[in-house]
Amino acid sequence: MEFPFDVDALFPERITVLDQHLRPPARRPGTTTPARVDLQQQIMTIVDELGKASAKAQHLPAPITSALRMQSNRHVIYVLKDTSARPAGKGAIIGFLKVGYKKLFVLDDREAHNEVEPLCILDFYIHESVQRHGHGRELFQYMLQKERVEPHQLAIDRPSPKLLKFLNKHYNLETTVPQVNNFVIFEGFFAHQHRSPTPSLRATRHSRAAVVDPIPAAPARKLPPKRAEGDIKPYSSSDREFLKVAVEPPWPLNRAPRRATPPAHPPPRSSSLGNSPDRGPLRPFVPEQELLRSLRLCPPHPTARLLLATDPGGSPAQRRRTRETPWGLVAQSCHYSRHGGFNTSFLGTGNQERKQGEQEAEDRSASEDQVLLQDGSGEEPTHTVAPRAQAPPAQSWMVGGDILNARVIRNLQERRNTRPW
């Protein structure tokens, strides 16, 4: 396989080993190249062209070897160049062999799963024009010596029929162990699995990895111990007791203290509920005297109102409680003043009963005036009514008035059965 640049100057040896960095090998003394030539770009071009030729020979839809894949994996390519002929003095590439370590789960002859990390043959290609000339065996044998591995210890990734014939012809690898993946292993693969890998192979691999990528391994992080999980039980009836909201009795019975005896052993709480506070009484504790006072001053029950509504007369206490404030109770309010009149707006809206009382008071005062005049003069009483101008109006009385007004108020209050003083 020919290239437009000088392959002989790029690869001084017949077999060149390339790692993931695709760097050109050390140059022989006396070899000169122009400074502008990008050697790494030439190596990437060679790898890409070899991958395309291998995919075409194996009838693969896409190449499995490329410069980009090489840079993202720790694989190794053994490149074989032709030193016999130098067309135009630039050299040519015969083929390549790509290998790498992979962690696999394979089955042994007893169909038991085994976790291994063998060296795998990932891609192998020799140009069609130089096949059957021993170039393939030369390249394969160089790889075995370099990696210090035996042919039966290898795992081959999707080998072609030509590769299987090649291994059978040169290394007597014929009997395979069936696997569930795309890798093929031969009989004798597990003969040395009970022993650790060859120290030289492992040391070579790790030393190569350290030189290629000298990055220290990250220290293992210790995870905290996992706490034991208890049984998660659903809510029981006892767990839900404290969540129940008590129904309050009708007023004023709800003002009475509810003395509930606390349980000796409270029900266990579920861990998912957290530390919820206990529900206290709905109302604070009310003393007995305050309870009796509230019962005495509380409004009547709707049932009692219904009974009083059906009774046309009702009880006297209820009538006194529900009817309007009489005149005599004005002295109990803040409207009373011994130096002036009281607020007449409180008496502005009278009813028929008030008018009736005023008329009776006027008649009685008139009769008393006649008795007093008869007692003072010794004459026969005359049924003459005092002029209205001499008697002050009933609604404009004052405590400092005459004796007649005081008597009228006294008689009126006795009739009302209430006393303001």
Swiss-Prot record:
One of its GO terms (biological process) is regulation of fat cell differentiation. The modification Phosphoserine is found at residues 272, 276, 315. CDD domains: NAT_SF (cd04301). InterPro entries: Atat, GNAT_ATAT. Acetyl-CoA binds at residues 124-137, 160-169. Transmembrane segments: none annotated. HAMAP family: mec17 (MF_03130). Component of the BBSome complex. Interacts with AP2 alpha-adaptins, including AP2A2, but not with AP1 gamma-adaptin (AP1G1/AP1G2); this interaction is required for efficient alpha-tubulin acetylation, hence clathrin-coated pits are sites of microtubule acetylation. This is Alpha-tubulin N-acetyltransferase 1. It comes from Rattus norvegicus. The gene is Atat1.
